[in-house]
UniProtKB/Swiss-Prot annotation:
Its cofactor is Mn(2+). The lineage of its organism: Bacteria, Bacillati, Bacillota, Bacilli, Lactobacillales. Belongs to the PPase class C family. This is Probable manganese-dependent inorganic pyrophosphatase. It comes from Lactobacillus helveticus (strain DPC 4571). The gene is ppaC. The keyword Manganese applies. Gene3D superfamilies: DHHA2 domain, inorganic pyrophosphatase (n-terminal core). Its EC number is 3.6.1.1.
Amino acid sequence: MEKEFVFGHQNPDTDAIGTAIAFSYLQNKLGYNTEAVALGEPNDETAYALKKFGFEAPRVIKKAAPEVNAVMLVDHNEPQQSVSDIDKVKVTHVVDHHRIMNFNTADPLYYRAEPMGCTSTIVWKMFNENGIEIPEKLAGLMLSAIISDTLLLKSPTTTDDDKKAVEALAKIANVDYKEYGLAMLKAGTNISDKSEEELIDLDAKSFALNGHNVRVAQINVVDLPEALERKDAFLKAMEASSNDNGYDMFMLLITNILDSDSEALVVGSDETKELFEKAFDKKLNDSEVKLPGVVSRKKQVVPPLTEAFEG
């Protein structure tokens, strides 16, 4: 059977990489010939999880078409978040937990989208539905993905299925998920050794909102005031990135994983800043605003932005 690539979105997080590995394993068990690849290097948190459970990072690809004719997508569907030549390959499978936007195919496909906290939760359900056993180390990686996306089950995106998956996978992986989860999340919060340019690109996604190209980046920290000491440098990097890439607005969400509070930094035109303020019903103060309890880009940031920009 002809090989297909399985991959998550650009600037991959633990869900994008971990779930690509898990879904590739599942599909191979079901008779497909797949390879899990990535659209970027793993971040510190993901590297911690990969090392903990004995996985090599998937190789990074820039294009898919030179090697394969077909691909399977996990943790995304929007083409601007996918491989650069996504229009040159056939998408045969999508497993995702985000909104569906700007996604079209010429042929029928397998598409599974559920409002779960993490794509790995959906893949866990698929393992169970197909009666396929999850190996211990893979269970640990899938567990890591769910912990990452749900901030140790504290995010408002968390569902009962996410909680069930965490309990089940932790048992298979033989780990205390609370102890391991906090250690893994903390591994991803060291920002001192990275430049502002690196940080605003680590976990960033682009969204097309009513003709506007909106970039939303997020970084997790354990010390919010310390991170905000770099505010001016962050804003400068965001302005430069916007100019280079044609973003109409760039939002950086800085989230304290310990108390689930965030601050947002925003650059853009007067128009897009007004739309941002409309979305969150808050006024920006020197390009900054407090967003208590906002931790999820998917559930708490993109929906109000979409409503404001398209309203």
